């Protein structure tokens, strides 16, 4: 019983020391970006994200380790499962039927864009 409690305490202590390092690694590998703007030509909108020629909003959550060009000021997002891209085409047609919710793309699908 004492040995089990000792290992449980040791495991908890190691978790306390490992948690900040894991959180720092996760923060380094992820970039969260949100923006509101109007897309400007060629499918590239404000902040340099692939976007449509319509106003809207989007929330990006993407792993930077997948981005070979991550040091460029205009990052090209590869859209994994955790990424969400939502746009509302309110200027072209404000009807609710034109609410566009684009499902996340896999990296393989993004390569063909």
Curated annotation (Swiss-Prot):
Its main location: secreted. GO terms for cellular component: extracellular region. Residues 32-45 are annotated as: 2 X 6 AA repeats. Sequence repeats lie at residues 32-37, 40-45, 46-49, 50-53, 59-65, 69-75. It is found in: Secreted. Residues 59-75 are annotated as: 2 X 7 AA approximate repeats. This is Protein USP2. The lineage of its organism: Eukaryota, Fungi, Dikarya, Basidiomycota, Pucciniomycotina. The gene is USP2.
């Amino acid at each position: 019983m004492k040995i089990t409690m000792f290992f449980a305490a040791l495991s908890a202590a190691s978790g306390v020391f490992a948690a900040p390092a894991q959180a720092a690694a996760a923060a380094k590998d992820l970039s969260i970006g949100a923006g509101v703007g109007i897309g400007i030509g060629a499918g590239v909108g404000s902040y340099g994200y692939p976007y449509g020629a319509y106003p809207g909003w989007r929330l990006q959550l993407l792993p930077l380790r997948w981005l070979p060009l991550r040091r460029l000021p205009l990052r090209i997002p590869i859209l994994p499962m955790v990424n969400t891209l939502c746009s509302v085409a309110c200027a072209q047609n404000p009807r609710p039927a034109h609410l566009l919710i684009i499902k996340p793309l896999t990296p393989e699908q993004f390569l063909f864009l």
